[in-house]
């Protein structure tokens, strides 16, 4: 999405940067992992296909993607590629419902899991979508056996609205309100820096 192509979102322990060509090779390595393919509902791509997808996503008006960097690694290495730990996306995939977005989060780097990097990243992404893209309802589709991700979204106030046995996924939604936005901002302010 061109809207976020020059946007950098600084959090306490993460930085969100637009998905660029320099990130593709490492992203492609992550996506060779069968578990990540399953959890994200992704098909394996060749490196060439991954580069083509990155270019398409940059042009698509309905996809907003950020690569998640570990802020502490980035500060010490000054390398976005070395600091990459995952990605977060907003898909505005229903034109008749232009103010609804599907939100996704993936922490691909196993060493970065369990450190609340996903929590901080998804809150930053949702705030961006609400404030910059005028999103007023968020939706998450999660594999039914991905208990950690389901728990994160429930903790964020999302409620289950559907379940698909065929796709083995649960759909959760959250209506945006000013009270909830204030709550999200308070959660961001309560995140403490850790350099681990």
Predicted segments — roles?
Residues 2-19, 23-24, 30, 72-196:
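Acyl-donor (CoA/ACP) binding surface of acyl/acetyltransferases
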Residues 20, 29, 43-47:
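Generic structural signal for well-ordered secondary structure
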Residues 29, 38, 52-56, 182, ...:
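Charged/polar, solvent-exposed surface patches and flexible loops
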Residues 36-44:
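A short gly/proline-enriched turn/hairpin at secondary-structure junctions
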Residues 36-37, 63, 159:
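A general structural signal for well-ordered secondary-structure junctions
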Residues 43-78:
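Active-site rim helix/loop that mediates acceptor-substrate recognition in acyltransferases
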């Amino acid at each position: 999405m061109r809207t976020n192509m020059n946007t950098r979102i600084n959090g306490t322990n993460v930085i969100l940067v637009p998905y660029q060509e320099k990130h593709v090779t490492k992203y492609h390595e992550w996506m060779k992992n069968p578990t990540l393919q399953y959890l994200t509902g992704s098909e394996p791509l060749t490196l060439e296909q991954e580069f083509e997808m990155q270019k398409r996503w940059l042009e698509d008006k309905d996809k907003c993607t950020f690569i998640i960097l570990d802020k502490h690694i980035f500060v010490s290495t000054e390398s976005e590629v070395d600091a990459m730990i995952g990605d977060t996306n907003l898909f505005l995939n229903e034109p008749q419902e232009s103010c609804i977005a599907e939100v996704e989060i993936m922490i691909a780097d196993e060493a970065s899991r369990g450190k609340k990097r996903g929590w901080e990243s998804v809150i930053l992404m949702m705030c961006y979508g609400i404030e910059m893209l005028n999103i007023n309802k968020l939706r998450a589709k999660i594999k039914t056996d991905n208990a950690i991700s389901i728990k994160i979204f429930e903790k964020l106030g999302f409620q289950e609205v559907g379940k698909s046995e065929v796709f083995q996924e649960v759909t959760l939604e959250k209506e945006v309100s000013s009270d909830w936005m204030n709550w999200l901002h308070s959660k961001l302010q309560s995140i403490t820096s850790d350099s681990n």
